[in-house]
């Protein structure tokens, strides 16, 4: 089965960058043709387009992105400060992003002058990241941290701080940082404040088709889903007999071991694995007026969920 490799993902990002450049060039040419008679306006439009071309390309598009006129270049050594509530998966994701960007991760307790520092925290913790955001930013989104998977990302003066509603929300902020760092080749990063949240609580994909798919391919898609802030993989494979015709039988240990691997991948990527029941099998040939028969099937179903 097809697996999305890291190399293919990088190739896709390069093609996406080329497409963005071509799109920008065509847009500039079109604007120029439209405004040639208005000579006094040419300089203004060129300046606006240039600013737009330097904007970060982040998907899904954040709710609020505000730039200032400053920029900075990340140092070769990047100091990371993790608040106590930041889990290992979130820490690992940041370290992966920094390493892929060609920088060296250094664990620190404080902001380090002269080198880049990245702070990760949780709203209301009063930790390093939370305190920095409270002191150095003004949140513009009403009730930001009452919203689903909300976070704020501030990048300025060699300090990047990401504070989320919880550790998973901070994780999604790192996905935004990853896209910022891969937007363009210029090493200079524009100073920015991003405020974002999800309009949908559950975001992801359902495996419910009748084609064959192996566990390696499932894991590959879960890791890809991480980068675009998906948070659920609902398993409903119609080629799995223990999901369909054998719904009342327990999975053999070999299959449980594979499922456990996907559960672990879900914890690493925040794209959580969710097994779903094929409920039509439960009701096939069942007399719902027979309480004993119903309870017998119900207990079988519970036993399967408890595996």
Language-model features: where?
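Sec-dependent N-terminal signal peptides of Gram-positive bacterial secreted proteins and lipoproteins
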Residues: 23-43
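Feature activates predominantly on carbohydrate-active enzymes
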Residues: 139, 144-307
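Short, Lys/Arg-enriched N-terminal segments with co-localized hydrophobic residues
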Residues: 1-12
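Intrinsically disordered, low-complexity segments of exported/surface proteins
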Residues: 8-10, 17, 43-44
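Acidic, contiguous N-terminal accessory segments
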Residues: 41-168, 176-195
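A short, sequence-level motif marking secondary-structure junctions
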Residues: 2, 26-30, 167-168, 178
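Bacterial Sec-dependent N-terminal signal peptides
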Residues: 14-25
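Generic early N-terminus positional signal peaking at residue ~5-7
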Residues: 6, 17-19, 31
């Amino acid at each position: 089965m097809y697996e999305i490799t890291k190399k293919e993902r990088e190739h896709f990002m390069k093609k996406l960058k080329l497409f963005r450049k071509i799109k920008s060039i065509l847009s500039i040419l079109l604007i120029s043709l439209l405004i040639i008679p208005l000579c006094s306006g040419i300089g203004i439009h060129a300046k606006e387009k240039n600013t737009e071309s330097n904007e970060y390309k982040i998907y899904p598009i954040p709710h609020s992105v505000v730039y200032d006129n400053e920029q900075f270049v990340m140092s070769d050594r990047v100091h990371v400060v993790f608040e106590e509530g930041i889990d290992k998966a979130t820490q690992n994701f940041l370290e992966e992003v920094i390493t892929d960007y060609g920088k060296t991760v250094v664990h620190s307790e404080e902001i380090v002058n002269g080198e880049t520092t990245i702070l990760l925290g949780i709203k209301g913790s009063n930790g390093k990241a939370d305190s920095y955001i409270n002191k150095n930013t003004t949140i513009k989104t009403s009730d930001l941290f009452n919203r689903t998977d909300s976070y704020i990302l501030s990048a300025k003066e060699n300090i990047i701080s990401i504070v989320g509603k919880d550790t998973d929300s901070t994780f999604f902020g790192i996905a935004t940082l990853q896209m910022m760092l891969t937007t363009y080749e210029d090493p200079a990063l524009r100073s920015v404040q991003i405020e974002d949240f999800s309009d949908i609580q559950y975001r992801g994909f359902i495996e419910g088709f009748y084609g064959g798919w192996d566990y390696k391919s499932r894991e590959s898609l879960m890791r890809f889903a991480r980068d675009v802030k998906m948070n659920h993989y609902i398993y409903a494979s119609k080629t799995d007999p223990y999901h369909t015709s054998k719904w009342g039988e327990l999975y053999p240990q070999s299959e449980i071991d594979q499922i456990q691997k996907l559960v672990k991948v879900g914890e690493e990527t925040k794209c959580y694995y969710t097994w779903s029941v094929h409920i039509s099998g439960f009701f096939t040939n069942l007399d719902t007026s027979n309480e004993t028969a119903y309870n017998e099937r119900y207990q079988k179903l519970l036993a399967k969920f408890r595996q």
